[in-house]
Design a protein with these regions (language model features):
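FMN-binding flavodoxin-like domain, especially the glycine-rich phosphate-binding loop
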Residues: 2-3, 19, 30-31, 53-57, ...
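A short beta-strand-loop structural module common to alpha/beta enzyme folds
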Residues: 31-44
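Surface-exposed, flexible loop/turn segments at secondary-structure boundaries
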Residues: 14, 43-45, 98, 136
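Short hydrophobic segments within beta-strands
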Residues: 9-11, 38, 93, 131
Length: 188
């Protein structure tokens, strides 16, 4: 199998989506591919690589209050025509705390990937999935005080358990992420 060229674009708020993008890049490189990874927040439009030079594109976004990051939404909306015309494989994923709940998983997967892409004009998704997120209540968390308080309250209402101050909960299923990435690699 010859080396494939893959782009990974992501938008992250608290680091969950960034961590997934990094792990996907590692897996794809371990399988003999060349991977370029970009946080859309730091990527000006004039620096976006030409899609036709690549065999695959994966796009990831965190979900907060039912919304993608602003940068991913703008990117997908602005490049929907090019993404639909892209000859390679297109993958999409989201990271959301709700996706870690088996009762919500399918709804999150469909609503925040396939349906959300369709609303922005992207009809071509070869593979998509939803992964859990992070609940980081440590002092070094990217979350602000109010966000931590809201998440703790919502978490206690839904699980009946109180999240401790300075606790860290990784709700991502790394086996699921590896399976998604290997399936994407196989489809290239």
């Amino acid at each position: 199998m010859s080396e494939k060229r893959i782009l990974i674009f992501y938008g992250t708020r608290y680091g969950a989506t960034e961590g997934v993008a990094g792990r996907m890049a590692e897996i794809l490189r371990e399988n003999g591919n060349q991977v370029e990874i970009f946080n859309l927040k730091d990527l000006p439009d004039d620096k976006i690589p030409e899609f036709s030079n690549y065999d695959g594109i994966i796009i990831g976004s965190s979900i907060k209050i039912g919304q993608w990051t602003r940068d991913v939404k703008k990117f997908v909306g602005n490049y929907s025509k090019k993404l639909n015309e892209f000859k390679g494989k297109l993958g999409f994923y989201v990271c959301s705390g709700y996706a870690s709940d088996p009762d919500n998983y399918e709804k999150v997967k469909i609503d925040y990937t396939q349906k959300a892409c369709e609303k922005l004009g992207v009809k071509k998704l070869d593979l998509y999935d939803a992964f859990g997120g992070l609940m980081d209540f440590t002092e070094t968390s990217r979350m602000g005080w109010l966000e931590k308080r809201i998440l703790k309250t919502v978490g206690q209402m839904t699980t009946g358990e109180k999240a401790e101050d300075n606790s860290y909960h990784d709700l991502r299923d790394w086996n699921q992420i590896e399976k998604f990435t290997l399936e994407f690699n196989k489809r290239l």
